[in-house]
């Protein structure tokens, strides 16, 4: 049998391990790369290679994250693993590693623990769409009833946060034994990989989503009209398309009469490209940075929302002091700052640098937003926090 040719055309899916400290997330990550490399080709990554996670910066925040890659016969996966709990919190809130699905690792010897709950809650808040459970260390539990009990607890916990607990795939395994090459436990890793392939749907590519362009600049070109520039966030824009200008002011409709890149006229602009769009009959002063051009009806402007926020610590260049309710910083969405006020959860009086917190925000101008939109919190141009829109209120 000839060796299967490596195809770059395989669908690309982003996943990651989440769960309580010491439940075996990193060991599982190593086991997946090792077992899949053995069965389907690819590179194995050793535990200590993954555990010594390099530092990276996302929105000015230092996060330790390890990225590994592996293949199943039908897909290519990029997988993120974080060494510390704080790194997970930052990672999920900043969207540094956007996950199409997560593998929740729960040690069968412990059952669900505080961080298990917190990671599920964060997953819900930041929009991780699918969770698969790996019940780890099952080689250390010989009581079938105990395993069933832990499984039931995990399902209840998932349901509590609006994940389909009853239908969630749960694999009983032992990451360490699989890593050590014990066949019956290697099987469990293949079973997990199969669930990744079948339970997590193929993510919709940015180019297939409705058109959206955050406006960075506005120019007036004599005799031709108004041009807005920016990087297409998603979708495709073609000459002749009708678009809406959304955010800050009342939503307005216009038509794109030309798309250009590097001063050359194009038929279309696609997700990821920096373009200029010429707008028919729109005056220079009717548009400003911070608005978006979007497919009509695809996105709406809002001022009030619930969010999950990480507040930078002093060492990360954040505030040195706590803030209280009524705090009025700037919220930076896509290309612009908008002032807003915050409300803290009941019983919370103040927020310390380094905390993560759920807060309700009220902006002074509406911004085009949907659930899952990331933002930074700034004071005088300095980033002091990162957040994600968890739920739109109005």
Curated annotation (Swiss-Prot):
Primary localization: cytoplasm
Disulfide bonds: none
Entry EC no(s): 3.6.5.3
Binding site for GTP: 19-26, 81-85, 136-139
Record InterPro entries: EF-Tu_GTP-bd, EF-Tu_GTPase, EFTu-like_2, EFTU_2, G_TR_CS, P-loop_NTPase, Small_GTP-bd, T_Tr_GTP-bd_dom
Protein name: Elongation factor Tu
Region annotation (G4) ranges: 136-139
Family named by the database record: Belongs to the TRAFAC class translation factor GTPase superfamily. Classic translation factor GTPase family. EF-Tu/EF-1A subfamily.
Ranges for region G3: 81-84
Region (G2): 60-64
Subcellular location: Cytoplasm
GO molecular function annotation: GTP binding; GTPase activity; guanosine tetraphosphate binding; translation elongation factor activity
Main function: GTP hydrolase that promotes the GTP-dependent binding of aminoacyl-tRNA to the A-site of ribosomes during protein biosynthesis.
PANTHER family in alphabetical order: ELONGATION FACTOR TU, MITOCHONDRIAL, ELONGATION FACTOR TU-RELATED
Catalytic activity of the protein: GTP + H2O = GDP + phosphate + H(+)
Catalytic EC class: hydrolase
